[in-house]
Amino acid sequence: MIGARVFKHSTVERMAKENQVPIINLLSDEAHPLQALADVLTMQQELGDLQGRSVAYIGDGNNVFRSLALASGFLGMEVRFSGPSEYFISDEDRDLSLIHI
């Protein structure tokens, strides 16, 4: 297993395609899954079951938001976002929390 902390997300994708071992994205410009995992584990530790709860993200629509929205949606949480208009989220990112895999 290889943990990759890279700038470009395409680097992680290329590594996964070219290697025989699993590649874990530790951080890229598109995603920060370990931060999302730490956030939801902390929320779960403090609040218990997260199903039906809401999480508010205030900031710019970046890799941290993207990963938190996906993780929160997977756990059945409602995601709310607020931030400056010049750093607002895309429609695709807005819909991430609606994806229940």
What is the meaning of each model-derived region?
Residues 40-65:
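Glycine-rich NAD(P)-binding loop of Rossmann-like domains
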Residues 1-44:
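Phosphate/diphosphate ligand-binding glycine-rich loop within oxidoreductases
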Residues 99-101:
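Conserved small/polar residues in nucleotide/adenosyl-binding loops
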Residues 15-18, 46-51, 73-74:
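Solvent-exposed alpha-helices and their adjacent loops that cap or buttress functional pockets
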Residues 1, 21-24, 54-56, 78-80:
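Structural motif
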Residues 13-14, 18, 70-71, 89-97:
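Active-site-proximal loop->helix
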Residues 57-86:
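Conserved anion/nucleotide-ligand pocket segment
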Residues 9, 33-34, 62-66, 88:
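Loop/helix-junction capping segments adjacent to catalytic residues or to phosphate/diphosphate-binding pockets
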